[in-house]
């Protein structure tokens, strides 16, 4: 089964509400939808970045250019079922650009799984679970609005874990914001925070203990991504769990963080690692070091979220659950099928491959004009 064609499409999908982070406010998400054709079948994948190149080194524009000009010409004519060869070819030809590689890797997994009439989860080893506890992100920047949102989610039995974005205000203001949310949800929910690199080590060392006292269970990426030493010291000094996100940008960074036991948990993201196989390798590194895995998101659409669900469903342990909220943050979906959240958990889609199919009318509607 030879690869016959690889196509890319940039789509821009508005969010239902602005998401305020320490580094930007997100009003829309841009994705590159990849379709790989072989043997009469089409596999689909997705690449993207939160807020474009502000968060990382890639954007929808760079992802499309790398695939169209470097990766696609390299892979056309190759065996679509040989996933290892495809990864090796991409890594030799292109340095970095992990989201571009991930988009193709996901599409090839989807294609192979469809050809074998298997789900991706079954293709890569089988499921440990059919659903995963899912956290909702509170990022309106308004305390009353965030509390109302949390209480509505609890009442609807959609979410009882909440992640609050910090770093856009002063630490003192953030602390009061958190205290109000923790008090409002009481014992009905847990609260974790994401600083998105917004603090230096001194600020983090002062305010993380206060967040812990307020009832926070986990602090995500409190300091800049390159400061592994600060992460290690903060992990050693605090009882609350420290989660690496932006710092976890390659297999080598996973090894360094694990070797030094610099954090308590890894936020896994397929686009950060270059695809499915490398994400599984990072999870294995974490397991060997006694570090927890967490199901992270790049605010993926239904395509990327389905791919992540298949991967996370195979892992032995996810004590903090996941945050695969992208499809519900967006104002519309790009697939024919919805994903389901029920009883505080997101459920693995059924069917071969990803378990979702593109809605080509929606893709055309959101395609960026040339």
From Swiss-Prot:
EC number: 5.5.1.7
PROSITE patterns found in the cross-reference section: MR_MLE_1, MR_MLE_2
Cofactor(s) listed: Mn(2+)
Gene Ontology MF terms in the entry: chloromuconate cycloisomerase activity; manganese ion binding; muconate cycloisomerase activity
Keyword Acetylation attached: no
Misc remark: Different ratios of isoforms are detectable, depending on concentration of dichlorprop.
GO biological process, one term: amino acid catabolic process
NCBIfam families assigned: mucon_cyclo (TIGR02534)
Family the UniProt entry places it in: Belongs to the mandelate racemase/muconate lactonizing enzyme family.
Active site (record annotation): 165 (proton acceptor), 323 (proton donor)
Organism name: Delftia acidovorans
Keyword set includes Metal-binding: yes
Keyword annotations: Aromatic hydrocarbons catabolism, Isomerase, Manganese, Metal-binding
Domain of life, source organism: Bacteria
Catalytic activity as recorded in UniProt: 2-[(2R)-2-chloro-2,5-dihydro-5-oxofuryl]acetate = 3-chloro-cis,cis-muconate + H(+)
Induction description: By 2,4-dichlorophenoxypropionic acid (2,4-DCPP).
Pathway: Aromatic compound metabolism; 3-chlorocatechol degradation
Name of the protein in its database record: Chloromuconate cycloisomerase
């Amino acid at each position: 089964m030879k690869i016959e064609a690889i196509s890319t499409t940039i789509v821009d999908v508005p969010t239902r509400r602005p998401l305020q982070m320490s580094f930007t406010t997100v009003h829309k998400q841009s994705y590159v939808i990849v379709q790989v054709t072989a043997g009469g079948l089409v596999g689909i994948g997705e690449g993207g970045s939160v807020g474009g190149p502000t968060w990382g080194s890639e954007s929808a524009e760079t992802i499309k250019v790398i695939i169209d000009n470097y990766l696609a010409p390299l892979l056309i004519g190759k065996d679509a079922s040989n996933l290892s060869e495809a990864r090796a070819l991409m890594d030799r030809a292109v340095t970095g650009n992990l989201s571009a590689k991930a988009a193709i890797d996901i599409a090839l997994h989807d294609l192979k799984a469809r050809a074998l009439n298997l789900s991706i989860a079954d293709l890569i080893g089988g499921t440990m679970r059919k659903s995963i506890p899912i956290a909702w992100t509170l990022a309106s920047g308004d305390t009353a609005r965030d509390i109302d949102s949390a209480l509505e989610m609890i009442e609807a039995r959609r979410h009882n874990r909440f992640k609050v974005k910090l770093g856009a205000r002063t630490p003192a203001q953030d602390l009061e914001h958190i205290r109000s949310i923790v008090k409002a949800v009481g014992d009905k929910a847990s609260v974790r925070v994401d600083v998105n690199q917004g603090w230096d080590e001194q600020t983090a060392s002062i305010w993380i203990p206060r967040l812990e006292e307020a009832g926070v269970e986990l602090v995500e990426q409190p300091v800049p991504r390159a400061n592994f030493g600060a992460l290690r010291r903060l992990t050693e000094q605090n009882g609350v769990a420290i989660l690496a996100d932006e710092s976890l940008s390659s297999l080598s960074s996973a090894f360094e963080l694990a070797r030094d036991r610099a954090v308590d948990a890894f936020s896994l993201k397929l686009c950060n690692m270059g695809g499915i196989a490398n994400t599984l390798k990072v999870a294995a590194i974490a397991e060997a070091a006694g570090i927890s895995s967490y199901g992270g998101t790049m605010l993926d659409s239904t395509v990327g979220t389905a791919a992540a669900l298949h991967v996370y469903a195979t892992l032995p342990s996810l004590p903090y659950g996941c945050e695969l909220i992208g499809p519900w943050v967006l104002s519309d979906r790009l697939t024919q099928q919805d994903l389901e959240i029920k009883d505080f958990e997101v459920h693995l889609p059924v069917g071969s491959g990803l378990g979702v199919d593109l809605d080509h009318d929606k893709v055309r509607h959101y395609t960026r004009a040339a």
